[in-house]
Amino acid sequence: VTSPENPAALENPATLLARAVVASLVEAGVKRVVISPGSRNAPLTYALADAAQAGYLQLRVVVDERSAAFVALGASRSDWLHEGLARPAVAVMTSGSAVANAHPAVVEADAAGVPLIILSADRPHALVNTGASQTTVQTGIFGAATRYQADLGDTNASGAVANQVRRAVAAASGRLSLDPGPVHLNVRLAPPLAPATPWQVPHLEPKTHWLRARKPLAAQLNGVTVSQVGCRLGLDPARRGVIVVGDNDDAELAHYAAALAHAWGWPLLAEPTSLVRTNANAVAAYSALLAGGDGSVGGDGAQLSQEIEQLLVVGHPTLTRPIGALLAREDIYQVVLTNRARWSDVSGQAAYVTTLEQALSSLNIPGGGAGAEAGADADAGGDASASAAAGAGAGVGKNAPSPLWLQRWLQAGQQQLNATSVTKAAQMALTTWQATSQYESHSQSTAIHSDGLESSVTLMAASSMTIRYLDAGLPAGKQLKKMPGPVVANRGLAGIDGTISTAVGLAWASGQPVRVIIGDLAAAHDLTGLVKAVTENEVDLQVIVLDDHGGKIFSGLEYGASELSNYFLRFFTTAQQVDFAQAAAAFGAHVSVIDDVDGLQSLLSETIEGRSLVHVKLV
């Protein structure tokens, strides 16, 4: 019965369904939504706007669905990086090809384990496969990449909708599965699509218990030492070991890797996005060293590699071939420590795979709850006694490592770094990183670095040569006077698309400045990520384009061989005709053009305000 006392009874079904979806998202802990304009998703847009007006959501409008999905991915990454909360951001779009445009971000989120919700509007079931306009089969469009999918529209019952939304949020967050990633909610909406009545948004209670939260390492240890955990993993402090840390977004795993390296005197072979590359045990130029680079006290890099007896692997190490070769060796005892149900072990050589929580629970040491600080303090002093190893069930190796084991690695890495010739592009990339590490921001928000220090700016690197320039040229951590902020890259599938848009999401969600370092091809892929609707707030984003006229990553691979040169320029270098300065200016970004290190250093010392692009001409 319709009556003024029951406003909902006057409302159309599409609007009621959209409001139920939005209310359920808010109560499940969702905070940020990226909206791409469209007709079929209009009911969702109205409901989201009302919820934002009521203070429950933060919205950003991005016209391109491909870019919008990457912006949402960046926002999700920001929450995990800065807040330790696996809170999925949402990308909302209309039906048809708009949904397919989210696929690149979805597969990156799948491979990287980033929470993400794709909320697509759809036509009613009756219109599918009839030739109706802007209608395709959207259910299952992302295939095996999603952790959960639901088709909403058969009922407007708020309880049924809330049930599906909560499941989607929990699945995206990895709350129960330890497998965070993308989910797809497909909402079927029939006209009328505009609301008939204003929505008086009810009191909603956002709950974070649907979201996975990162637990501080000290609280996890709860009096147990990192050495005891290491021994429980089957690692032996008396044998020569190395810790490999690939792309990693979990600060607690980074803390553990750094603490064990300190306690046992093991070197860290850490990628720039590992969160431990600036640790005192991190080895400079480790990849070149493993490939047989310049020597050290007691042997060259290849000799050091042959002396490794055991490996602890953390994160997703895919950046360099020498690390891949190291992880493929059958003569090294390897342990993978992960925080997810999926782990990296490309060659299948891992003897043991576990989470930190599982390792701690299996110890079951009496009195382990005596206090987290005791465990942390013991390891700070290098507690790696044989008795602790024996007590954790690990034997002591016959060949105790020399106390110089770490020093040999650090010295060899430094010698390799000193001997490495630096290209102009690499010099520009390293200059950008150095300036970013010294950047002072007026922002009130800061990011907690894995070593417990704070920084106010994030560096986003494209997954091509730029991240490799950093990997090859960053100094050892012990040489740093100030701890830089985190380095982020889309290393899930290591693609170059979406880099700028992801950085927009990082800057939007964190409220902090973000600097992007990117090559010309990767920039051309995602230059429209700089587009901003006139109604949207600015983000503090600076994009440094290292323009060496094409993709130079292939020149260092087998495709760059002289006998294949007839193919190389057209099919691999693929230089583009793009005037980055004019294009960025057309999108409303401030533009600078430079061609030398001095000019770059001067520009990088300025405050990052609004959107800007620096075109660095290398050729």
State the predicted function of each range:
Residues 31-32, 77-93, 99-101, 108-115, ...:
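Structural signature of the thiamine diphosphate
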Residues 108, 115, 119, 126-139, ...:
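Thiamine diphosphate
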Residues 1-28, 162-235, 401:
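Cofactor-/ligand-binding subdomain signature composed of acidic, glycine-rich
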Residues 18-22, 26, 39-45, 403-511, ...:
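Active-site diphosphate/adenylate-binding microenvironment
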Residues 14-107:
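N-terminal cofactor/phosphate-binding cores enriched in small/glycine residues
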Residues 36-38, 94, 186-189, 244-250, ...:
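Structural motif
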Residues 120-164, 168, 270-371, 379-386, ...:
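Glycine-rich, acidic loop regions that bind phosphate or pyrophosphate groups
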Residues 69, 77-81, 101, 228-231, ...:
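Glycine-rich, anion-gripping cofactor-binding loops and their flanking helix/strand elements
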